[in-house]
Amino acid sequence: MASLNGPLRVGIGGPVGSGKTALMEQLCRRFRDRYEICAITNDIYTKEDARILTVAGALPEERILGVETGGCPHTAIREDASINLAAVAEMRRRFPKLDLVLIESGGDNLAATFSPELADITLYVIDVAGGEKIPRKGGPGITRSDLLIVNKTDLAPLVGADLSVMESDTQRMRGTRPYVFASLREGHGADRVATFIVEAGGLR
């Protein structure tokens, strides 16, 4: 099902601990029986996120590739994406019929974005535990990503966050761009994210 232009590449960004790896796992589980898929993770000095996906059984080990970025993680997805482009090329070599590549960035700040050369669609994950004010802080991930995921809604009562305020701020910051409120550890909201990828990415 791969297109003549190669597989659909989906970039998943967001701060450390926001739930990027949880989203990767949920998406792998939903797509692995429908599409030829692989996952690429970015960590500064380790391959921990790749290990987590492997241990969780999200995909076969050979379909998960960990990239050690070193230094500043946003450089590897934006200013100099060569290390990730090489990882995509390696996975295409291993699996010539790839339909979908999920690329998880290393945890970074709200200003991190994916190079258009690397990702066709960008998802950005923030979490309720970071505080009710996070959506209104803005930044490219919040305002310009193709889909914003506000994760860990189950923690709202514990951190004193008002989800209605967060949703209002999200709508104000994003305009007509879509968003999903989710609790990814339980899988809540993951189906909506998967549907968005299929529809926005033109997967069949």
UniProtKB/Swiss-Prot annotation:
Keyword field: Chaperone, Cytoplasm, GTP-binding, Nickel insertion, Nucleotide-binding
Compartmental location: Cytoplasm
Principal cellular location given in the protein's record: cytoplasm
Subunit structure: Homodimer. UreD, UreF and UreG form a complex that acts as a GTP-hydrolysis-dependent molecular chaperone, activating the urease apoprotein by helping to assemble the nickel containing metallocenter of UreC. The UreE protein probably delivers the nickel.
Similarity section: Belongs to the SIMIBI class G3E GTPase family. UreG subfamily.
Entry function: Facilitates the functional incorporation of the urease nickel metallocenter. This process requires GTP hydrolysis, probably effectuated by UreG.
Family annotation (HAMAP family): UreG
Protein name: Urease accessory protein UreG 1
Originating gene: ureG1
